[in-house]
Structure formats: structure tokens, C-alpha cells
Design a protein with these regions (language model features):
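Flexible, compositionally biased loop and terminal segments
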Residues: 1-204
């Protein structure tokens, strides 16, 4: 199944490159790619320099394929039961990512979300929409379109491809909505061992 999905993704990428990203069928273009890799605990140990190099490598791997949006999320929390990330560590992680993002260049819009619990995030987004005082319609009706827009923001299109760094037996806990209609590709390699060559292999 994974091989078949990857073959379909490759075919779509080749068509997008051959036509310069232009096609009569919008479904043939990869507009949004999600990469789920590493645990939140591993992310915390990443320096600003490592984040800069990692994000730049990701952009360089997907940009030639015409990708407009790249979202990066952890696979899981990586913490033992009862173990949590401290506020100081979370603040340091957010700062490292923000500083690294300033050095990312290219035509791809990059979104990095450090939340590892996709179900918790889903509930928080739903509650936020229902309690939105500026939108009276949200109190009575919550449409699929509004929910998708809030979950994917600032990206404005559903993911076409989800690349998971890890074995195909483990789905990312950070993704709930994004995997429903996306093609899944698994690359069984650790976060710290990931290189630009691995990313190129995954999307080539």
C-alpha cells in the first residue's frame, strides 16, 4: 500500500514539474506537504543552527516540485508517562524555531507546529471556534470548511502529501485532520539522522 501511494505521489510530482506547476486538473499539483518527524523531546534539543539547516534542507527538497506550503510537526511527544516539557524548554524551542525561520529563504511558505497531541489541538480549535464572539454563526453551526481553515491556518489548502519519518506501524499523534485524505509516505529514519538527500529521495 505504501509503495502504491508513493508511486502516485511521484507521478503527480513529475507531472507538476513537467508542466511548470500548471495543469488543467488542480488535483495533480502538490500544493501542501506535511512532514511529521522527530519527537517533541528531540525538537527541544535542537539548536537554532540545526533548525536553520533542517528547515532549509526541507525547503530545498520540496520547492523544485512547486510546493506552496510546507508544514512541519513532531511525530509524538517522546516523553515518558508523567514526564512533561517545562515552560522554559517550550519557550526556548519556540524561540529557536522563530529565529531559524528568519533565515529560511525560498518561495515555500513554512509552518512549524510543535504540538504533539493532535486530539488536544483539535478540541482546542473547536472550542475556540464555538466561543468566537466575533462570529455569531459559530455558536450554532460549525461547518467542515471553517474547521479545516482553522486547523490548517495559516495554510489555505488541505495537505496533498504527508511524509512521516518513522516506521509505517506508527502514525503521528500530532496529526488528526491532516491524514484523512492525504497520501502517506513513510521514511524509516530518525530525526537526528535526516539529511537533504533523504528528503529528496522521499519526494523524487
Amino acid at each position: 500500500v505504501i509503495r502504491r501511494l508513493k508511486a502516485r505521489a511521484k507521478d503527480r510530482l513529475r507531472r507538476a514539474v513537467a508542466t511548470g506547476g500548471r495543469t488543467d486538473n488542480p488535483e495533480e499539483v502538490l500544493a501542501h506537504v506535511v512532514i511529521a518527524g522527530g519527537t517533541h523531546k528531540e525538537w527541544v534539543s535542537f539548536s537554532v543552527g540545526k533548525w536553520s539547516r533542517r528547515l532549509e534542507a526541507m525547503v530545498q527538497a520540496v520547492e523544485p516540485e512547486g510546493v506552496q506550503w510546507l508544514t512541519v510537526v513532531p511525530v509524538s511527544s517522546g516523553y515518558a508517562v508523567g514526564e512533561v516539557c517545562s515552560e522554559d524548554d517550550q519557550k526556548a524551542l519556540d524561540d529557536a524555531i522563530a529565529r531559524a525561520m528568519r533565515h529560511v529563504s525560498g518561495r515555500v511558505d513554512v509552518v512549524v507546529r510543535s504540538e504533539a497531541d493532535g486530539r488536544k489541538r483539535f478540541v482546542e480549535v473547536v472550542n475556540h471556534l464555538r466561543n468566537d464572539r466575533d462570529d455569531t454563526s459559530s455558536r450554532s453551526t460549525l461547518s467542515e470548511g471553517r474547521l479545516a481553515k482553522a486547523l490548517l491556518a495559516p495554510a489555505d489548502v488541505e495537505p496533498d502529501l504527508v511524509l512521516v519519518l518513522g516506521p509505517p506501524t506508527q502514525l503521528p499523534t500530532s496529526l488528526v485532520w491532516e491524514m484523512a485524505y492525504s497520501e502517506l509516505v513513510f521514511l524509516d529514519i530518525g530525526w537526528n539522522d535526516l539529511s537533504e538527500e533523504h528528503l529528496l529521495m522521499a519526494v523524487d
